[in-house]
Design a protein with these regions (language model features):
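N-terminal secretory signal peptides that target proteins for export/translocation
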Residues: 1-14
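Extracytosolic low-complexity repeat regions of secreted or lipid-anchored proteins
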Residues: 109-161
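Mature extracellular/secreted ectodomains of secretory-pathway proteins
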Residues: 77-131
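Bacterial N-terminal signal peptides
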Residues: 18-29
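N-terminal segment immediately downstream of the Sec signal-peptide cleavage site
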Residues: 31-100, 158-174
Length: 174
């Protein structure tokens, strides 16, 4: 009887130990996935990017939310393209269609974060056909623990040179 009790106790002990190790491994994996949900804002004033080949600029306004683990994004806003003289030649709306990547750079608080977001958008020009598959990069750089507002950027297609405006990321859920 005592041998049987020892065997059962040892079996339960080994099972509990294995279960504990499994739970510990799962917790370690979850804590190291760097799961995060962020909001991004283009505005205050809206960022402007220059196309160095044409001299045209694009002004992007809007906001969105993305999840780094689910690789999802929802976002929308408006845009305008101006010629090299500053006259608006196109207006429309944009919508986020695909999350690509996010490089978190931290920040002074969850409400103010730096980073680089890569996504794909569709442009809906007024009076024109939708333009799909357009790459967009939102940049809110942090250098040496401080924001570099001069390099904030919402690059869209060939519009890649920062030309003023504000972008910001907000950490909603770590």
């Amino acid at each position: 009887m005592s041998i049987r009790r020892l065997t059962i106790s040892h079996g339960w002990s080994a099972s509990l130990r294995s279960l504990g190790l499994l739970l510990l491994a799962l917790l370690f994996c979850v804590n190291n996935t760097k799961a995060a949900v962020y909001n991004f804002t283009l505005g205050g004033p809206p960022p402007v990017a220059l196309n160095p080949n044409t001299g045209q600029t694009i002004k992007m306004a809007g906001s969105g939310t993305f999840d780094t683990v689910a690789a999802s994004v929802v976002g929308a806003g408006s845009y305008s393209i101006s010629n090299s003289e500053g006259r608006v030649i196109e207006r429309g709306n944009w919508e986020a269609t695909q999350f690509s990547d996010f490089e978190a750079q931290g920040g002074p608080s969850p409400g103010i974060q730096g980073g680089i977001l890569h996504l794909t958008i569709t442009l809906f020009p007024k009076g024109g056909d939708p333009v799909t598959g357009v790459p967009m990069t939102v940049v809110c750089p942090v250098e040496d623990g401080a924001f570099d507002e001069d390099d904030d950027l919402a690059a869209v297609g060939a519009f890649t040179v920062p030309h003023g405006g504000i972008t910001v990321f907000h950490l909603l859920r770590p």
